[in-house]
């Protein structure tokens, strides 16, 4: 069922919101890991998810699950409902179980779509905590801009962020903030690499 959804959703997205994945090989790490990416559009989860042939899971605000048909659709696509207003223990347990079962988990650590024009909003600490608790890699990605119909967009896959110093240790508030900062730097660095790629691409055309 997932592969059917994947095929038709990607067909729709690529037809109306074309995009190119740069450095896709960096996403081909075996085993579970957490993907962190900036968040600009409702199509972001499909763009990021298309980096993987196997099913990847991602957090999705619980409001999308109010209607049975939508809840069924998003659940089939790997969505995990989360309450953004407070600490959602059930979502946390589901995420931990997902990673422990060897799956990939996509998180947009800004917590909402960025409509400010800034490169990133404040980064929440959940992604780093999940990765540290399960001892998995964190792979940063960066989307160039908000998706617009028939306008090509770009997604850059960065190299893993090293958080191994936190594996097997208690993650207190200070560690959570340090992990969030590492993730912030990793996403921004990946964005810089995307800009460099696009500049080089322009230079070759001249």
Feature annotation, model-predicted:
Residues 23, 58-60, 81, 140, ...:
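Structural signal for conserved beta-strand scaffold positions within catalytic alpha/beta enzyme cores
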Residues 27-86, 94:
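Catalytic core of membrane glycerolipid acyltransferases/transacylases, capturing the structured
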Residues 92-206:
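Non-catalytic C-terminal accessory region of glycerolipid acyltransferases
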Residues 25, 39-40, 52, 62, ...:
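Short, flexible active-site-adjacent loop segments at beta-strand->alpha-helix junctions, enriched
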Residues 1-34, 43-44, 52, 76-79, ...:
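Membrane-anchoring hydrophobic helices of lipid-metabolizing enzymes
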Residues 20, 87-91:
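Glycine-rich, highly charged phosphate/nucleotide-binding loops
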Residues 4, 87, 175, 179:
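Soluble or luminal CAZymes and related metallo-dependent hydrolases
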């Amino acid at each position: 069922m997932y592969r059917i959804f994947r095929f038709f959703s990607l067909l729709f997205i690529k037809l109306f919101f074309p995009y190119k994945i740069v450095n896709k090989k960096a996403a081909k790490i075996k085993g579970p890991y957490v993907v962190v990416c900036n968040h600009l559009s409702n199509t972001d989860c499909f763009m990021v998810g298309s980096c993987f042939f196997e099913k990847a899971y991602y957090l999705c605000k619980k409001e999308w699950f109010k209607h049975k048909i939508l809840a069924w659709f998003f659940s089939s696509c790997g969505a995990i409902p989360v309450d953004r207003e407070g600490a959602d223990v059930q979502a946390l347990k589901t995420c931990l179980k997902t990673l422990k079962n060897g799956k990939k988990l996509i998180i947009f650590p800004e917590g909402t779509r960025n409509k400010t024009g800034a490169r990133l909003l404040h980064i929440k600490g959940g992604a780093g905590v999940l990765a540290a608790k399960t001892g998995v890699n964190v792979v940063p990605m960066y989307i160039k801009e908000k998706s617009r119909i028939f306008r090509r967009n770009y997604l850059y896959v960065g190299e893993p962020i090293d958080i191994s110093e936190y594996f097997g240790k208690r993650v207190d508030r200070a560690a959570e903030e340090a992990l969030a900062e590492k993730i912030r730097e990793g996403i921004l660095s990946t964005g810089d690499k995307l800009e460099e790629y696009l500049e080089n691409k322009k230079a070759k055309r001249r």
